[in-house]
Amino acid sequence: MESEEWLLYEFYEVYYVLFPYFAWFFSVFLDTRPRHTLFGAKIGKNTVIGNGRLFNPERTIIGDNCFFGYDAILSGHVYEGGRLYLKTVRLGNNVTVGANSVILPGVEVGDNVIIAANSTVPKDRVIPPNSIWIRGKAIPRKDMPPADEVAEAIDTAKDGQ
C-alpha cells in the first residue's frame, strides 16, 4: 500500500511540474477548479483559485468565498533535512491569499483572514479568524491601524531597502 501511495504522490509531482508548460493548451478545456477537485481538493462555493497553485490537492481543504492572488502557492508537503513532511492545509471561509504568497503544510487559516501578498505562512501555523497575516504575524482586524498609516509604513519599508 505504501508503494502505491508513493507512486500516486510522484504522479502528482510530475503533473504539477509539467502542467504549467502545457497550461495554455489545457486552459481552453479545463478550468483550474475542476482540475484540482479531480485530484482530491475540497473546494467551497464561489472560491477562485485562478493562477494560484495547489500542490498536493488531496491534502487541501478550502472554504467558501476564497480568493487566490497570482502565483499564490498552497502546499501540503515540504522537505526538511532530507525527509518529506506531509500534512493537510485548511482554509476557512472568506479567505484572501495575496499574490506570490506561500502556505506550507499543516496550516489552519480561520474565517475572514487576509494573507498579505509575498507572505509565507510557516508549517503547522494556526491563523485566528478575522485577522491579517503580514510580516510573519497575525494582526486582528480590529487592531489594524488606519489605511494611511499602513501606506506610510509600506513607503518607509521601501525606502529602507
Which sequence ranges carry the predicted segments?
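Glycine-rich hexapeptide-repeat left-handed beta-helix
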Residues: 70-71, 75-161
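Left-handed beta-helix
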Residues: 17-90, 94, 100-107, 124-125
